[in-house]
């Protein structure tokens, strides 16, 4: 399976909304396998969303995951400076783990 993530980068002002898309080359057998991560320089990836749409503990409700099948979306509402990072979708199966190529979110006024 190949995960195609778009856009590769996005620059947005504080308070705006960012939408990140992830398209799978084949249907994801179970949404339980789809997750979204946030990574900042020098830090390990942080789990934001699992099971395609479930917020991880401590993650603000401004982050929303949606989608099924081959199309998945991460939406960040009311973007804050702290949201500047690279975001990745990930599909885990019994055999392997596949990440999307990443989306760098740059927050204007950072």
From Swiss-Prot:
Residues 58-89 are annotated as: Framework-3. One of its GO terms (biological process) is adaptive immune response. Disulfide bonds: none annotated. Residues 99-108 are annotated as: Framework-4. Residues 36-50 are annotated as: Framework-2. Residues 51-57 are annotated as: Complementarity-determining-2. Residues 1-22 are annotated as: Framework-1. GO terms for cellular component: immunoglobulin complex. Residues 23-35 are annotated as: Complementarity-determining-1. It comes from the Eukaryota. Gene3D superfamilies: Immunoglobulins. Keywords: Adaptive immunity, Immunity, Immunoglobulin. SUPFAM superfamilies: Immunoglobulin (SSF48726). Residues 90-98 are annotated as: Complementarity-determining-3. PANTHER family: IMMUNOGLOBULIN LIGHT CHAIN. This is Ig kappa chain V region K29-213. It comes from Oryctolagus cuniculus.
């Amino acid at each position: 399976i190949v995960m195609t993530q778009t856009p590769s980068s996005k620059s947005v002002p504080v308070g705006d909304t960012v939408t990140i898309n992830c398209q799978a080359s084949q249907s994801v057998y179970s949404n339980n396998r789809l997750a979204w991560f946030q990574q900042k320089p020098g830090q390990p990836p942080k789990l934001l969303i699992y099971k395609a749409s479930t917020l991880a503990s401590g993650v603000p409700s401004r982050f929303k995951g949606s989608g099924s099948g081959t199309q998945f979306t991460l939406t960040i509402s009311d973007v804050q400076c702290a949201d500047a990072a690279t975001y990745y979708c990930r599909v885990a199966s019994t055999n392997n783990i596949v990440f999307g190529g990443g989306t760098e979110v740059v927050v204007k006024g950072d």
